[in-house]
């Protein structure tokens, strides 16, 4: 049994603490990140696989950290993105346009790998039989596609027949294609940005110097850690280069968490993985919650041995349907009754929670009845580098 010391008096099993996910909440400076580090230290000491999604770079100096700084020494390989990933990446909500964008990606893959010609895959006057043969040949090819061709390929996806239904289309449905114009502007804007190109490892312009530092596919690291014991190491995915762009940060984290869940579900034999997402409220897409990677792990991850620890400043920052996926809470100081109403199990402890000292927390949930007040251990070597400026 894997046991985690939380305080001088209390040691709990990892199964009891984490198998129903753990939410760590508390006001800024109350000690929630330090508590998360104490738990991760207990897991690492016993060679349990742990990962952190770090929004600010605070955790990159932890001992034995394997640091993947996205946009610097790590990237998300655009060649491996699915149609569903592209829809998330470019913010497509309309189901019809989502389908067209996925089709456009498949078409460009056919053009690159089957037709082996530059440009787009034309669908005007192409027979359905020929298209089905091409699709049948299309498996996972290493040849990348040019995302810059997506706008032109999208137009081909609106080919419609006139009087010959053996072909995909004889003319372009221009009114249908016009619905894609906002998406096309978004694609052109994003794919022309250097930061976007570096993050997704897109081919750089000829006059652009290649990065001097070694770069690693972060999805490879995710698969590596998800399938093996970590040799007392911790994977830190540093998103700090995108801290100024919340929309891009949400997409990055959803792509990472979706890929991690997908990888865990495909592994026949894998190890338990604990994923800490610090300041999780930054990354939750409330309007697209069911497809958000964080929510999907909260709902589906346990069956695959994938367990969440989220830190956030207030339960009000998270949707109720996400809160409902957590069976356990580590609650540092909260100051308002409205916050406590989000977690009914805590309502009788409002005064206690409001007056807790830094580093004190209430451990509550299904396996901790009644809740326990604990003075969390401080592990000096796990001290994260806070970015809060100090007065002088």
Name the predicted role of every residue range.
Residues 19, 232, 305, 358, ...:
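Active-site lining segments that contact anionic ligands and/or coordinate catalytic metals
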Residues 41-42, 57, 61-67, 78-296, ...:
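P-loop NTPase motor domains
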Residues 21-23, 49-51, 232-236, 272-274, ...:
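Residue-level preference for the first positions of well-ordered beta-strands
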Residues 10-11, 22, 28-30, 241-351:
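Conserved P-loop NTPase motor cores
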Residues 1-76, 291-294, 320, 363:
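Glycine-rich phosphate-binding loop of nucleotide-binding enzymes
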Residues 10-14, 321, 327-392:
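P-loop NTPase motor core of the ASCE superfamily
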